[in-house]
Amino acid sequence: MFKALKSIYVYLAAVILVVAACEKNAGDRSSSEGWESPYDLTGLTVDGGFPIVAWTGITASDSGTWLKEMKGCGINVYLGWYDTIEEVMTVLDNAETAGVKAILNCDELFSDTGNIVGRMKDHPALFAYHIADEPSTSDFPMLKDAVNRILSFDDAHPCYINLYPNWAWGKIDDYLQKVNAFLTTVPQRFVSFDHYPIMEVGGVSSFRPEWYKNLEDIRRVARAKKLPIWAFALSLAHYLDDVTYPVPTLGQLRLQQFSNLVYGAQGFQYFTFHGIYRNTPTQVYDRVKDVNASLQALSKIFMGAEIVDVWHTGASLPYGTKGLSSLPQGITSLKTSDVGAVISQVVKDGRTYVAIVNKDFNRDMTLDIAFNRKVTKIDNMGYKAQAQSENITVSPGNIVIYQIH
């Protein structure tokens, strides 16, 4: 009898060990023990953190130095395109030395796909293949063929395609349908789009009224397709017709990336690296470094999390958004000043959080909030403190998070 029981115990212990090993090796889909992300993040993180991407601006010859400077401000992925595979391999080698990843292409990727993918796919610095930026709907069949051809040689690395913002792609209310058509046609591991919301017209700063509608639609399609979102902040001042895109302040960068964050973004991008570093760091370098440190600190909460809902407060609500008609559980009162806030309910690891972003990129926001449950307050660097009902100021574009126990 004792030997029989002992054999059963040994068998059960072995089963438990096998199950545990299988769970441990299940990839990145479980962002932490016991929690399954609503989307697959396998191969879409960098050193256990968010991918933070700088777009273009580094020549192959400069990459040995500039990629190290890029990493210094918290950017861990470089995206660029080159004429030859030799340049691509140089950038990959230098990226590995710098400790970053790369999303790259060259002309031959599409004309000699098998050979080029064969040279790139096993390089440890390769994050993804760069396929296209802002394609038209008529490009979708061609992109489908290009992606499938690459995936036939390498299905371990994603193919990167970035989509138009809603204001630049026909009627704003048709945007969701176009994104859905793209994701239905072209195989994608994540959905990337650009929208640079902060602009100046006649010397007056504002953000595009369609911006939050863009985030709403991307979030809706991404949830339906179970795909993570990649979004942008603008780091390069430039002109477009009568619109000026200014050198971004810290408040403007925070507003863009923290709004992306609370809408569920899992990848964060900057256009372009030239706005951050050009032979020497620009005035934007330290601001980007500050924001990136916050993003990685908050990845413990937001990476792989479910964004249950998003609301807006303020005197007027952005087009396509909804107001806070009922309060999240545990909150009995919530009031904000002036421009208002983006409010997001986040669930991860069985824990519930409410994240609040000041939508004003110029001025502090007053936040008056009350609770009927135990609450932990978390700042933009992940530091925690016990909280009670309070009246606080939130700096321009900044974020504050409350864990509701």
Segments from the language model and where they lie:
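Bacterial N-terminal signal peptides
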Residues: 9-18
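Glycan-processing catalytic domains of CAZymes
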Residues: 29-374, 380-405
